[in-house]
């Protein structure tokens, strides 16, 4: 019995299985019928059939799915809390006030770079990309939509800013996990990341500034501002009091309050504002918390901004994450990851090829596991001996883990991060993917440094020998 449980797929079987999964997900996305969710669900059926055909214990394999899903339960709860917060913020007039002030104060040409900077600062200070996207990101999306700026561009600026802070903040979970996996010091890890992150951030800021001036040329009039503001004033009581939920969540995040608790308390505050300021009933507030807000405004642009939110709107994203992460856990149990990763590692013959291999492994593990922690652990576990053999400092490995595993999330439509960004910002993955400049420039710089030797620190020979003797 134990022999049956330990049986795994070989390399050809693993590649065939991955091809089936990719095709099923791609077909569902292409046909626009259920998105990746049905394709990912089908992958569970494929796994069951493969287990039966090749005599592998399905009970043992599916246990890997449940173990993997347990790791992302906080993310699932966070998604639903975000849905509640968006709905209650809309009902309380918080979003309407932000839109009104933004239209009056922000020059549309500068919205994209300002969005990038705002989300970057908030994410660095709070240490959470989820929190900055759910608060500042939602607000900037609303302003951008009202200004007629391409929603994919605004979402791209939000995500790049949030991921920049998440990657560099000493309070971020990924910033602490990567050096822990690579056995590097936190300070060395952050200093090493500056080499790949700061140049790409400057380039990203320049690109969003250029896009901002191109997007708003001749497409924004004073008349449209008046129409939008009058419509918002007609439906909501606007003012500082409606900003209490937004101010509260920023304060709570700065005080290191758990993200889910901060979102929940902000939603409660929004409910009180809705009841006492907007004069909504308790039944209306509870209904909005689940079903989302529906505006009476007839202006199409404002309808697209205000008609959203609610816990129910996030359930499809919860399902995608469950199926995707569960699939990743089963693939690890089947040995699919090990076969593919080992095939990549065998081709390493220089520091440059080692960095390139680490990037590829990081993206492959992210693509399959759909989880940042799992991608860091799997990649670090596989590549650490290779880095030690070539006497490359551990902070270079931890930097590579972040340059690939952390940055890959929003670039994968079924990854937990990709699903979260699309669901929270209300923008399709295909719309914001072309504007994730920071995310796909960072690994390019990392690989360039690997082949040129720039910033690649090697361990002293004596130190390496001493560590070997101790072992």
Provide a role label for each language-model segment:
Residues 1-77, 195-205, 209, 213-320, ...:
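Hydrophobic transmembrane alpha-helices of multi-pass small-molecule transporters
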Residues 4-13, 100-107, 123-129, 229-238, ...:
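Short, amphipathic, aromatic/basic-enriched membrane-interface segments that mark the entry/exit
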Residues 22-26, 48, 117-121, 142-143, ...:
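Alpha-helical transmembrane segments of multipass membrane proteins
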Residues 31, 167-170, 178-230, 389, ...:
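Juxtamembrane and boundary regions of transmembrane helices in multi-pass small-molecule transporters
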Residues 55-145, 298-385:
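Membrane-embedded alpha-helical segments and adjacent helix-loop junctions characteristic
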């Amino acid at each position: 019995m134990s022999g049956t449980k330990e049986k795994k797929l070989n390399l050809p079987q693993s590649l065939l299985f991955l091809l089936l999964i990719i095709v099923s997900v791609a077909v569902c996305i292409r046909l626009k019928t259920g998105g990746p969710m049905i394709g990912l669900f089908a992958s569970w059926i494929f796994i069951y059939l493969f287990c039966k055909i090749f005599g592998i214990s399905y009970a043992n394999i599916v246990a890997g799915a449940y173990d993997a899903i347990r790791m992302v339960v906080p993310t699932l709860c966070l998604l639903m809390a975000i849905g509640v917060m968006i709905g209650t913020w809309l009902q309380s007039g918080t979003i309407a006030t932000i839109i009104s002030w933004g239209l009056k104060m922000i020059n549309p040409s500068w919205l994209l770079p300002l969005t990038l900077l705002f989300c970057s600062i908030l994410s660095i200070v709070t240490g959470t990309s989820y929190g900055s996207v759910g608060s500042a990101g939602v607000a900037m999306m609303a302003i951008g939509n009202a200004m007629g700026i391409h929603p994919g561009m605004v979402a791209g600026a939000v995500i790049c800013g949030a991921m920049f802070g998440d990657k560099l903040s000493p309070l971020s979970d990924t910033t602490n996990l990567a050096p822990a996996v690579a056995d590097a010091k936190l300070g060395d890890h952050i200093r090493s990341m500056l080499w790949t992150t700061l140049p790409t951030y400057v380039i990203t800021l320049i690109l969003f500034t250029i896009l901002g001036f191109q997007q708003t040329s001749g497409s924004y009039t004073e008349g449209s501002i008046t129409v939008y503001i009058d419509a918002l004033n007609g439906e909501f009581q606007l003012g500082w009091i409606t900003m209490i939920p937004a101010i509260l969540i920023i304060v709570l995040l700065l005080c290191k309050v758990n993200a889910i608790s901060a979102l929940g308390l902000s939603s409660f505050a929004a409910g009180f504002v809705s009841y006492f300021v907007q004069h909504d009933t308790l039944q209306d507030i509870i209904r909005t918390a689940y079903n989302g807000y529906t505006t009476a405004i007839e202006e199409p642009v404002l309808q697209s901004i205000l008609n959203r939110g609610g816990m129910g709107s996030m359930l499809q994203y919860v399902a995608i994450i469950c199926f995707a992460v569960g699939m990743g856990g089963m693939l690890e149990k089947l040995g699919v990851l090990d076969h593919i990763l080992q095939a990549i590692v065998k081709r390493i013959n220089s520091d440059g090829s080692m960095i390139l291999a680490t990037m590829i492994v990081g993206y492959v593990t992210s693509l399959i596991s759909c989880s940042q922690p799992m991608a860091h652990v799997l990649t670090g576990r596989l590549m650490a001996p290779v880095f030690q053999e070539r006497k490359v400092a551990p902070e270079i490995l931890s930097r590579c883990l972040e340059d690939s595993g952390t940055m890959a999330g929003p670039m994968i439509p079924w990854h937990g991060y990709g699903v979260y960004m699309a669901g929270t910002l209300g923008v399709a993955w295909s719309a914001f993917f072309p504007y994730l400049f920071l995310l796909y420039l960072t690994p390019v710089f990392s690989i360039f440094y690997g082949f040129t030797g720039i910033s690649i620190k090697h361990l002293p020979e004596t130190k390496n020998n001493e560590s070997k003797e101790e072992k």
